[in-house]
A protein has these predicted regions:
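Alpha-helical tetratricopeptide repeat
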Residues: 82, 151-152
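Solenoid-like repeat scaffolds
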Residues: 139-144, 174-180
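Short, structured interface segments
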Residues: 128-142
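Generic helix N-cap/helix-start motif at coil->alpha-helix transitions
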Residues: 11, 144-151, 186
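N-terminal alpha-helical interaction modules that lie
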Residues: 1-100, 107-125, 161-177, 201-233
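Alpha-helical protein-protein interaction modules
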Residues: 168, 184-204
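Intrinsically disordered, low-complexity segments enriched in charged and polar residues
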Residues: 2, 19, 156, 182-190, ...
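Charge-dense, low-complexity intrinsically disordered regions
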Residues: 152-155, 159
Length: 233
């Protein structure tokens, strides 16, 4: 279900306007230091209004700490996660427009934004532009360097989005990236739940996720085989 909170809707519109003014509408021209400071002040006000925390405090918190702030009874608040991810992504784009796309701060902001937006999607935030936002961040943070935890988030995101083939790809990569028996058992548990759920769906619903009933059985067998190989190695 799309967001109906008026504050969040206004925030999304404000950051869209900010991006249009300083990034997408600049035809490749870098923004000035003064424009960067002005944008940071505007973003600071938006962080405070939506999350009750300053931009500086948000920067000091790691992804897990940020997610802890967004959780209620163990569940991530989807709308707040979405707006935080959008704010971080916007700040990353603005910093990159001044310092360059390879700037460490820009990369860090974009990676944090990606993690938060994946969690928002896994919590079924329902925003129509979420896929576009995630894909844009992936272009700036290629999967080759991702930690295992991000593939776990990607798996849950794609599963929640109904993109079952993509979810399975993330699942297998997650298995390859984790280390240790306990971590691999957690992947196996997630895989069993995933395939069990898919078997309850109609063929038409599986097809919408680029999957088939035969592929459910094949995927389960392939993952079990790879799991055994990793344990034996």
């Amino acid at each position: 279900v799309p967001i109906r909170d008026e504050l969040i809707q206004r925030t999304i519109q404000q950051i869209a306007n900010l991006l249009a003014r300083l990034v997408t509408g600049r035809a490749g021209h870098d923004i000035t230091a003064a424009e960067l400071r002005e944008a940071e002040q505007e973003l600071d006000e938006l962080y405070l209004a939506n999350l009750g925390s300053s931009r500086a405090l948000i920067h000091r918190l790691g992804t897990e700490d940020l997610l802890g702030v967004l959780r209620t009874s163990g569940t991530v608040h989807a709308e707040r996660a979405y707006v935080l991810g959008a704010l971080l992504a916007t700040e990353g784009a603005v910093v990159a427009a001044h310092h360059g796309a390879d700037d460490p701060q820009a990369l860090s902001l974009r990676e944090s934004a990606l993690d938060i937006l994946l969690e928002a999607g896994a919590a079924r935030v329902g925003e129509p532009d979420l896929r576009e936002r995630v894909d844009d961040l992936v272009r700036h943070a290629p999967p080759a360097g991702w930690p295992a935890a991000r593939f776990e988030r990607l798996f849950r995101f794609e599963h929640a989005m109904g993109a079952f083939a993509r979810a399975e790809t993330a699942l297998f990569t997650w298995l390859e990236r984790v280390e240790g028996m306990q971590a691999r058992l957690e992947v196996a548990d997630a895989a069993n739940a995933f395939y069990d759920e898919l078997l309850t769906l109609e063929d038409a619903d599986l097809a919408k996720g680029d999957f088939s009933r035969d592929e459910v059985h094949e995927g389960r067998a392939d993952l079990a085989e790879r799991f055994a190989e990793l344990l034996g190695g």
